[in-house]
Amino acid sequence: MKIYIDFDDVICETAKYFTKIAKELFNIDVPYREVQFFNLQKSFDLSGEQYDELMKAGHIPENLLDYEETPGASEMINKWVDEGHEVFVVTGRPFDSYEPSRRWLDEHHLNRLPIYFVDKYGREMFKQDHTYNLTLEELYCMHFDFAIEDSPAAFEHVQHFKDCKVAVYDRPWNKQVEFPDESFVRCLDWQEIDRLWQQQAAFQIADLSI
């Protein structure tokens, strides 16, 4: 079976690192638990220029490599790969962050996972034709049985996958969001995500045996 996994704030603790950068750059002290919006410009009350500076700093290779792993992520993902499932990392990171992103995965024992970069949020200014880039249209043509996302802005994308259960990793910026439908389920940690996946896998197997 095929599994889609978002990168930031699902596999690694991106927002927590950005709160640190905002403090260092602008002396803006917003605790992680108070990051109420996926849009960090809004969460940190930044000007356009400040936001650009924040995003640039957050995607410097040495900073990307410093992001902490979300507890339990690599262990659970590797268990799924060992069970024979196809697992893909699908990220909305800037296309030019491929090398450090690939290295981060490799250093956290996720070297077996392919990673695809998709312009999920309309941030890319130029079309880039690399083997690791996908257009939204190409993404929508793919099939996934299970997806893990945290960003409300990305929910519309995973809705294109037919019969796909979506685990929403519980984060401050999605706590007040109304989910699109019953296929979206809030999970507090990777253990809950695994339980949801096992239920989905069992359902899929039972459905195929009918």
Regions found by a protein language model. Name each.
Residues 1-50:
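Active-site neighborhood of HAD-like aspartate-dependent phosphohydrolases
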Residues 24, 82-83, 107, 160:
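Secondary-structure boundary motif
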Residues 28-32, 87, 112, 146:
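Residue-level detector of short coil/turn "hinge" positions at structural boundaries
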Residues 61-89, 93-101:
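Short, acidic loop-to-helix structural element flanking the phosphoryl-transfer center
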Residues 97-210:
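C-terminal cap/substrate-recognition subdomain and adjoining C-terminal extension
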